[in-house]
Swiss-Prot record:
Species: Xenopus tropicalis
Subunit-level organization: Component of the N-terminal acetyltransferase C (NatC) complex.
Residues forming coiled coils: none
Pfam families according to UniProt: LSM
One GO term describing the cellular component: NatC complex
Family: Belongs to the snRNP Sm proteins family.
Protein name listed in UniProt: N-alpha-acetyltransferase 38, NatC auxiliary subunit
Taxonomic classification: Eukaryota, Metazoa, Chordata, Craniata, Vertebrata
Gene name per UniProt: naa38
Gene3D superfamilies associated with the record: 2.30.30.100
Residue ranges annotated for the Sm domain, each copy included: 28-106
Length: 113
């Protein structure tokens, strides 16, 4: 096993010969995340709330930062559908994320995949 120093200064152990496939998988994941930057997305949370905002960044713990975020509450018997609450910059802890939907490139109305 060899120690590998990553860009952020962290080191990790790697086995001989496995570095090439790990690097390719890491590059693919990185490119996928980069393609999502500045795209609108909807995040469903464990407590039933939904946040819609612009994807700005994430980290190793899967926390997500949304810009210009709006919060939507799940309608219930005691709370009817209300106007969204404007949050601005919001950090969503990764362990509270149920699903993420990315807005399709559309000129008309926002559609999520």
């Amino acid at each position: 096993m060899a120690a590998v120093l990553e860009e952020n200064g962290c080191s990790r152990q790697s086995s001989p010969g496995a570095g090439d496939s790990d690097a390719e998988a890491g590059d693919t994941a990185r490119h996928k995340l980069e393609s999502l930057l500045n795209r609108n997305m909807r995040i469903e949370m464990t407590d039933g709330r939904s946040l819609i905002g612009c994807f700005l960044c994430t980290d190793r713990d899967c926390n997500v930062i949304l810009g210009s975020a709006q919060e939507f509450l799940r309608p219930s018997d005691s709370f009817p559908v209300r106007e969204p609450r404007v949050l601005g910059l919001a950090m969503v802890p990764g362990h509270h994320i149920v699903s993420i939907q990315v807005e399709l490139e559309s000129v008309t109305s926002p559609q999520y995949i």
